[in-house]
Amino acid sequence: MMNPDGGDGDRLEAAGAGSSSAQQGHPTMEWRFAQVFGERAAGEDVQEVDIISAIEFDKSGDHLATGDRGGRVVLFERTDARDNASRREMERQDAPITRHPEFRYKSEFQSHEPEFDYLKSLEIEEKINKIRWCQTANNSLSLLSTNDKTIKYWKVQEKKVKQVSVMNLDSRSVGTGTSSSASTSSSRGLLPNGGCSDKSSFLNSDILFPPGGYPSLRLPVVVASQDVNLVARCRRVYAHAHDYHINSISTNSDGETYISADDLRINLWNLEINNQSFNIVDVKPPNMEDLTEVITCAEFHPTHCNTLAYSSSKGSIRLIDLRQSALCDNHSKIFEEHEAPGSRSFFTEIIASISDIKFSRDGRYILSRDYMTLKLWDLNMDSGPVSTFQVHEHLRPKLCDLYENDSIFDKFECCLSGDGLHVATGSYGNLFRVFGCTPGSTEATTLEASRNPMRRQIVNPTRPTRTLTSLARGVRRGGENQGVDANGNSFDFSTKLLHLAWHPTENSIACAAANSLYMYYARRCLRKFIVFGSLLEAACLHMQPEIWCRMLSSIPPLGPKEAVDAHKMAFVAVTASLLIL
């Protein structure tokens, strides 16, 4: 499935902002803007507490959760109806697919509050570091959220609103009286049943009593209405188990346990037990001066409940089996790339630190993100990554500046598509990159988190050399000077896209730019454009028969609709050839 030759990382980096490229037979993804939540106006200041710090889809893709630096968790739910027809069948027939996942705001709740550790004289901020969905039951939503020290297990349920009915007084009889009017009414003679002594209508500014009063007293009745409210309830609090900041949580496929990781330890928890955890990984040396690496991320295998992986600041990924021993000091496999001789520098170890890892949906591959690259690892091949994708190679000459402003320590996340054919990660300037993983693919797309994801390319166009084939396929190259913006200024390294998530079943990405949540969807470019490019290229070569045969043999099998379109485009190609001749 994956590219064994290293993924053509250099060629991937050559594709600029808003561009994509692919070889024949490998359809590219056409990305479009879908939705935005919390979009800020031009010149509007962003509050620190509103910046999004975590994004996560649930396994079905029907719900999305975000956490922010203010300790809040916001839930979104999918609103569009799902098609009953097979998506793969529709793509095979080139049927137009206009639907894309649409979400709406569902609920929010305060997950964490700022705290103070009096024993260590340490402030614990409320920022949400990670969110993970748990298996649900009874139409409820369950998730884990964590800050630096405390993990909480939340259950969100729909509750019907209860109302009080059958009141003793008609709501229309209630006035707007005051205490003075009430005292006035008490001075007048009333019967024990509330009636007037003179058997006449008694009216004050509070209550209108009927003549003779009320014959009986009716108790209020509580009834459930059709209105539904979402109620978030904290079921468990898992605290006092980590001496260092928690950087990861991951739920197990057994639905009963999860892990939490800090810089030196990984703990195993049972969801139903909050006062006990088991330390399964401990990399703390007897003497802290001998410490050479720390844990940066940990993730459970998606299907094997006994397997998990964790990454380190030295760029290695260790796979451990919980069945080996209670304390997993020894790993079953280690994945690391050996550095080339003579290439070591002061920044080598810093940029090699892995900030995030993700398993593919089938559990066969691991995607890792270090500061400069994305790497795809095959669990069956620990000699090196099967693909390496350069994310922002143009920043390598600026590592000194990045070190001075601490940007070199930014932790970018990564994600894989549900089918495992694409990977994505963020960069600076609110950009994120999407790469193709199919064998031989050179697909690379750079998008900006805005309503117009191609805005950077439109503002700063270039005119590289193009062939007629690349023109027909819509291949566009970005600016050569990718380290500057449209005005020629250096990128503002504070505008960075750290967090993003891929929909588990569809080609849709949610990403966070400061306090704004942007969502994009993609459609595969129809193969008829590849057919057109091949026909037009053959036309440019003066219709030589051997060239025709070679071009047409490289075209993938066509569906019924594609065949009709191919005939139409063949006519265009012939016309173009006549003009050339």
Curated annotation (Swiss-Prot):
Each WD repeat, start to end: 47-86, 123-164, 241-279, 290-330, 349-387, 492-530
Protein name in the entry: Serine/threonine protein phosphatase 2A 55 kDa regulatory subunit B alpha isoform
A GO term from the CC aspect: cytosol
Compositionally biased spans, kind Low complexity: 14-25, 172-189
Family (UniProt): Belongs to the phosphatase 2A regulatory subunit B family.
A matching Pfam family: WD40
UniProt GO molecular function: protein phosphatase regulator activity
Keyword presence, Repeat: yes
InterPro entries with a match to the protein in the record: PP2A_PR55, PP2A_PR55_CS, WD40/YVTN_repeat-like_dom_sf, WD40_repeat_dom_sf, WD40_rpt
Job of this protein: The B regulatory subunit may modulate substrate selectivity and catalytic activity, and may also direct the localization of the catalytic enzyme to a particular subcellular compartment.
Region Disordered, residue ranges: 1-27, 172-192
Annotated keywords: Repeat, WD repeat
Superkingdom to which the source organism belongs: Eukaryota
Gene3D superfamilies linked: YVTN repeat-like/Quinoprotein amine dehydrogenase (2.130.10.10)
